[in-house]
Amino acid sequence: LSEERRVKSEEFNSSSDDVSNKNEREESEEGEGQENSSLFTHHSSLYKEQFVGESFGRINKAEAELTLLTLAEYFTKIGKQRVLSESIDVGIISPYRAQVQYLKKLIKKYEFFKPYRRLISVNTVDGFQGQERDVILISLVRSNDEGQIGFLKDLRRMNVAMTRARMKLIILGNKDTMTKHPFYKKLWEYVEGLNNEE
């Protein structure tokens, strides 16, 4: 993955090398039945968080773009017809309201998501309590050299977020920041172990 990679068009052209997106993960190419149900997609520290105020917390715009590119790849992989005919619903969760608002803005912006918008919900961790979706993407936002993760240390809340997916869980974050905390280090190692078993 080029660390400077950005979404190159509003159409999310998913048919080129632009979406090979290794992100330090390997996915099975042998069929959807063999694909792991959990992924931890790592990005570099160039994807920096920004503090935007007490009410809205933090935002990581590059990670938000990566989150939607990852979802576009997944939809493309399993096929538009299947997504729509089976009404495969998606929840995008972030602990920060600023990130939630930015993700909603991007979903409205990109034409790729127009057929799927009714199937996509974006909310905070607390906003998703008691709900499930077929696919869950979690944008962790925090990306700093100090390993500061704020209330992502509230493991009860994060555990709730991570158990909302029926089919597929995709966690997006800066591994170097997050794995300074023992819980996220174990989570990374667990998901890597799943990938290595393929």
Residue ranges and their predicted role:
Residues L1-S2, Y47-Q101:
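Conserved helicase/translocase motor-coupling segment
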Residues R97-Q99, G127-Q129, R142-D145, M167, ...:
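Conserved nucleotide-binding/hydrolysis micro-motifs of P-loop NTPases
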Residues R117-L119, V125-I136:
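Conserved motor-coupling elements within RecA-like helicase/translocase cores
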Residues V83, L106-T124:
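Flexible, glycine/threonine-enriched loop-and-boundary segments that flank and lead into catalytic domains
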Residues Q131-R142, I170:
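A short beta-strand element within the Helicase C-terminal
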Residues S2-E11, S16-N21, E26-L46:
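Short, basic, low-complexity termini and linkers enriched in Ser/Thr/Gly/Pro
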Residues A64-L68, V100, V122, V135, ...:
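Amphipathic alpha-helical transducer elements in NTP-driven molecular machines
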Residues I107, G147-E198:
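Helicase C-terminal subdomain and adjacent C-terminal extension
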